[in-house]
C-alpha cells in the first residue's frame, strides 16, 4: 500500500494566477493552516520528474539519478514521478497485439507507447539492455521472458537506490505509474489485464518494511528498517553462488546487528576482488567533483561508484595502504572522463614521489599495468592532461601483488541475502544475479535445464470476502539452479489466466533441494468449478 499521498496544485507546473493564490489561501483558511501547500509536483524543494526509462541498476545508487526541473542540490530527495518501460508477459502481449505485428518491433508497438509516442520511456535503451544483458531475443516469447528480468532488476534498484540513502538526502519515491489504463508496453507494475509484471515483483521486494539489500554502486549490504520499532540482535548473512549452484565460501559474510527504527543500518561490504590490496584502505585526492563520490569510491571494489576530480589537468588521487606492501600490478578502471596522459608514482611518506610508469596516449577503459615488483606504502595517479572537459574519473584504482589471483566466480553468479531475528526467524531475504562484466548476464543462458516438482491444493477463504487460495509447494529436485521461476494459475475450462490474483512471490530462484511455498488468492467467482492448473516455468526451462 502507498505510505503517503501527495496532492499538488498542478502537475509539473504551477497553477495559473490567480488559482495558485486562491488555493494557498483556501488551505490556510479551511484547513486551519496545518497542511503544507505544494503548488508544483516536481519543484519547490522536490527533485523533479523522471527519468522514465530503465537504466542499469547502479544508476539509481550513484550521484545523482537526475530528474527534470527538480532541485539538484537536494540529491535523491523526494521524487514524485519516476518510472521505466515495462513490457508485459507474452500471455498479455498476445491479447492486444495483432499476430502480424508480434515480431520484430514495428509501428504498432509505437501505438502501444513503445516508440516515439513515449520516447521518454527510452524503448531503444530498453531493447539494448535486453540484448546486452540476456542475449538477442529469438522471437517475441523470448523477448517478453527476458524483459521481465530487466523489469525486476531496474525497478527494484530504483527503490533500493533511494532506500540506500534514506534520510541522508533521500526521503521518498513515487512510481509513474502503478497501472496503465490502456494495453501498454511502458509504465506499469501490473498490466491492463491485472497480470503482475517483473516491475511489480522488484518493487514489492524492495518495499518490505524490514528489508536487507545490496548496493550495485559500492557492494555494501544494509538493513532498511522503515518501521517504528527498534530491532535488536538481528543476524545478516550474505552468500555467493556460482552458476552451478556451488557456494563460494570465501565471499560469505555475516554479522549480528541492531536496526534502529526508521533508519538504514550498515552490515558489511562484499569484496569480489579479495586480493585487491587497495580495498578498504584510505584514498586522498586533489579535488572531488560534486557529481561523484569521495576518493574512497575508487577503492571500494565496485565499478558502480566512482571518484571524479574537478575539470583541471593537474589533478591527482593516491592510495594509502597503511604500511608498505609489494605491488606488481596496478589496475585503473576509467569512466568516460579519462586521462589523455598521466603518471603513476610511489612514495614511502606521501611527500616525496618517484615515477614508475607514464602513459602519453591513454584510451580509457580498464588498464592493467604490470610493473617491476616494488615495495611501497603510497601509490598515486597524477594527471597530466584530461581527455575530456570533465576532469578525471575512476571507477576503480586497484593494487595487486606479484600474483593476481584469477577470479573463481563464474561469469554470472548469485548473491543471496538473509536477515533473521534474534530467535532465528526469517525477516527478509533478497536475491541478485551479478556479472563480472556489469550488465552482461548472457551466461544465464548456459544454465542446465531445471527440474521442478509441484504440489498444490485449493482452499476456500472467507475471513475477508469470498476468496479461493491455491497453495503450492515448488521444489527444485534437479542438480541445476532453477532460475527466475514464473508461476501462473490458469483455469482448466478455458485456458485463461486467473486474474486478478494476489501472490506472495514470483520469479524466484531455487538452489538444489530448495523449495518455495506459494499462495495465489483470487475471488471465488473467477474459478466456479474449482478446476485449475499451474504453469510453473523457470528461465532455464
Describe the role of every protein-language-model region.
Residues 236-238, 242-274, 404-409, 497-525:
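Intrinsically disordered, low-complexity Pro/Gly/Ser/Thr-rich segments with frequent PxxP/GP/PP motifs
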Residues 228-247, 477-496, 537-539:
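Short acidic, flexible loop segments centered on an aromatic residue
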Residues 274-324, 333-342, 348, 358-365, ...:
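Disordered, acidic Ser/Thr/Pro-rich linker "stalks" and the adjacent N-terminal cap
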Residues 1-110:
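Active-site region of glycoside hydrolase catalytic domains
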Residues 196-224, 228, 245, 434-466:
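Low-complexity, acidic Ser/Thr/Pro/Gly-rich terminal tails and inter-domain linkers that flank the onset
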Residues 271-275, 406-445, 499, 521-541:
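Terminal connector regions
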Amino acid at each position: 500500500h502507498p505510505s503517503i499521498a501527495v496532492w499538488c496544485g498542478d502537475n509539473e507546473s504551477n497553477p495559473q494566477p490567480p488559482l495558485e493564490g486562491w488555493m494557498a489561501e483556501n488551505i490556510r483558511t479551511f484547513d486551519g493552516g496545518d497542511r503544507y501547500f505544494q503548488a508544483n509536483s516536481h519543484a519547490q524543494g522536490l527533485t523533479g520528474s523522471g527519468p522514465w526509462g530503465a537504466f542499469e541498476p547502479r544508476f539509481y545508487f550513484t550521484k545523482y539519478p537526475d530528474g527534470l526541473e527538480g532541485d539538484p542540490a537536494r540529491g535523491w530527495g523526494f521524487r514524485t514521478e519516476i518510472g521505466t518501460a515495462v513490457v508485459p508477459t507474452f500471455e498479455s502481449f498476445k491479447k492486444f497485439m495483432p499476430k502480424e505485428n508480434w515480431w520484430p518491433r514495428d509501428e504498432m508497438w509505437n501505438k502501444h507507447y513503445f516508440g516515439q509516442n513515449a520516447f521518454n520511456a527510452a524503448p531503444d535503451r530498453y531493447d539494448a539492455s535486453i540484448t546486452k544483458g540476456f542475449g538477442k531475443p529469438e522471437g517475441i516469447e523470448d523477448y517478453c521472458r527476458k524483459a521481465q528480468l530487466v523489469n525486476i532488476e531496474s525497478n527494484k534498484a530504483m527503490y533500493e537506490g533511494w532506500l540506500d540513502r534514506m534520510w541522508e538526502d533521500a526521503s521518498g519515491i513515487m512510481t509513474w505509474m502503478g497501472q496503465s489504463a490502456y494495453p501498454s508496453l511502458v509504465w506499469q507494475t501490473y498490466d491492463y489485464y491485472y497480470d503482475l509484471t517483473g516491475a511489480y515483483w522488484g518493487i514489492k521486494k524492495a518495499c518490505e518494511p524490514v528489508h536487507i539489500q545490496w548496493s550495485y554502486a559500492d557492494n555494501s549490504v544494509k538493513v532498511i528498517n522503515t518501521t517504528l520499532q527498534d530491532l535488536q540482535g538481528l543476524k545478516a548473512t550474505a552468500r555467493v553462488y556460482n552458476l552451478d549452484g556451488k557456494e563460494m565460501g570465501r565471499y560469505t559474510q555475516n554479522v549480528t546487528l541492531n536496526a534502529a527504527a526508521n533508519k538504514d543500518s550498515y552490515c558489511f561490504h562484499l569484496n569480489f576482488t579479495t586480493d585487491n590490496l587497495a580495498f578498504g584502505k584510505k584514498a586522498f585526492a586533489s579535488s572531488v567533483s560534486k557529481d561523484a563520490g569521495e576518493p574512497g569510491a575508487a577503492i571500494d571494489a565496485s565499478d558502480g561508484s566512482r571518484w571524479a576530480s574537478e575539470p583541471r589537468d593537474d589533478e591527482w588521487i593516491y592510495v594509502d595502504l597503511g604500511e608498505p606492501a609489494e605491488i606488481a600490478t596496478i589496475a585503473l578502471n576509467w569512466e568516460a572522463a579519462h586521462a589523455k596522459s598521466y603518471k603513476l608514482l610511489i612514495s614511502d611518506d606521501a611527500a616525496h614521489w618517484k615515477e614508475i610508469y607514464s602513459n602519453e596516449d591513454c584510451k580509457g577503459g580498464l588498464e592493467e599495468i604490470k610493473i617491476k615488483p616494488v615495495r611501497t606504502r603510497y601509490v598515486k595517479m597524477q594527471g597530466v592532461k584530461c581527455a575530456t572537459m570533465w576532469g578525471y574519473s575512476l571507477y576503480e584504482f586497484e593494487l595487486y601483488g606479484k600474483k593476481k589471483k584469477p577470479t573463481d566466480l563464474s561469469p554470472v553468479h548469485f548473491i543471496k541475502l538473509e536477515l533473521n531475528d534474534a530467535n532465528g526467524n526469517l525477516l527478509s531475504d533478497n536475491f541478485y544475479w551479478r556479472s563480472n562484466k556489469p550488465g552482461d548476464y548472457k551466461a544465464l543462458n548456459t544454465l542446465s535445464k531445471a527440474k521442478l516438482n509441484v504440489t498444490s491444493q485449493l482452499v476456500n477463504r472467507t475471513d475477508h470476502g469470498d476468496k479461493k487460495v491455491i497453495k503450492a509447494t515448488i521444489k527444485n529436485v534437479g542438480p541445476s539452479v532453477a532460475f527466475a521461476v514464473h508461476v501462473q494459475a490458469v483455469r482448466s475450462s478455458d485456458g485463461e489466466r486467473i486474474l486478478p490474483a494476489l501472490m506472495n512471490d514470483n520469479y524466484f530462484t531455487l538452489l538444489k533441494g530448495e523449495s518455495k511455498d506459494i499462495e495465489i488468492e483470487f475471488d471465488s467467482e473467477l474459478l466456479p468449478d474449482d478446476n485449475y492448473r499451474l504453469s510453473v516455468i523457470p528461465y532455464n526451462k
